[in-house]
UniProtKB/Swiss-Prot annotation:
Ranges of residues in domain TrmE-type G: 217-389
GO biological process: tRNA methylation; tRNA wobble uridine modification
Organism listed in the record: Psychrobacter sp. (strain PRwf-1)
Pfam families tied to this protein: MMR_HSR1 (PF01926), MnmE_helical (PF12631), TrmE_N (PF10396)
An annotated GO cellular component: cytosol
Protein name per its UniProtKB record: tRNA modification GTPase MnmE
PANTHER family noted in UniProt: TRNA MODIFICATION GTPASE GTPBP3, TRNA MODIFICATION GTPASE GTPBP3, MITOCHONDRIAL
Keyword line: Cytoplasm, GTP-binding, Hydrolase, Magnesium, Metal-binding, Nucleotide-binding, Potassium, tRNA processing
Amino acid sequence: MTHTTTIAAIATPVGRGGVGIIRLSGPKAYAIACALTGKESFTPRLASFCRFYDANNNVLDEGLVLYFKAPHSFTGEDVIELQGHGGMILQNQLLARVFELGAHQAQAGEFSYRAFDNDKLDLLQAEAIADAIDATSAAAASSAIRSLTGAFSNKINEVLEALIELRLYVEASIDFPDEEDVDFLSDGVIEGKLQRIQQQLTTILSTAQQGQLLRDGVHVVLAGRPNAGKSSLLNSLAGQERAIVTDVAGTTRDTLQETIVLNGLTIHLTDTAGLRDTTDAVERIGIERARTAINQADLLLLVYDLSQEVDPLKLASELFGEGIDGTPNFDPSKLLLIGNKRDLVEDKGESANKLADKADILGYEQVNVSCETSQGIPQLIASLCDKVGFHPPENSLIARTRHLDALRRTQQHVDEAHQQLVIYQAGELVAESLRQGQYSLGEITGEFSADDLLGRIFGSFCIGK
């Protein structure tokens, strides 16, 4: 699509820096660069050292000009990059002059949107740009770059082509039932192709689920009675003294958040106030916030003191209520029992696992640790990753919630097509289910996308990208 306006924005982070970059894209970009510098021409892809002048021919700054001639640019339009000195005063003065010469302020993600609009990249690749910038771990950054280079798109397009081909095959079977060279619905060919597509979707969905964990991380909450060692555990996992630790019960009175990376997984860790009955107004507010955090957690680490011979399941029942079967009213898949102060128990020659068997039998996993000696911490990290299903493949791909939603809807439509074929031999319904599956899968790369979806996606980008 041809855009009639020329957009500009500062492309480097706000603040002091050695270099500040202003990016322009659009039909006037080249002319603006010439007017700004007094030069008559620029050679594409060759850096030119220039001075930048205001309307009165005063020097605003000096630096490099890079010219990317359409369509051989990021956006597919004429693109100019002005590389001057960093610092907001110089950058804002230079940008204001660019606006005087006819450019408009770029909106969030507008450069990437134009690249998408001009078929320089698909929606998956555009999102991967933002995900690479926002990555909180090396694994997430690497996965985003793989998606940016088209690895994820290639997998989606392969299945999309198979869906289109199969849909055409089914429609041909309906339209030409008497042709000898066209197979019918009952010959097994269509079912075989459907099964292969189902297998491909299952594999891609599994990879995408790992990619979503890489991108978003998980929200993990530490909870338990006062003085159980929650804050000490947060410090152990964070590798630094983030929470105040004392022998006084109730030291933590509010939630404390820390983002850490363990085994490649980003964990948004929240320490909470100890759960108990209290008349202290401030502590009660902290406990209310703790329960709110617990309800929103992807995983709860229920910390208890091994030296106090606490039954963790009884503790969980006291804190969260008891089900009709006598077990805690809390989903075992979202709960990890953490026996702390293991060193104190073992120093006495006692076993730290005396209650573990009971918990395991009932489906509640227990890990015993010592924040003092770091015993059990590696096992806790491994159990945490396993609990949330984090097992990324070597060549993982970044993914978002909308990708998973689209993949699941595609799976549902393909499963429906298989059912219509095997049970009812209903060719028209098979073709319709395949059409819906094709549409759902195409949403991922942007082949089929509503304008409001595109607005939400590109609106979340930073200015200048």
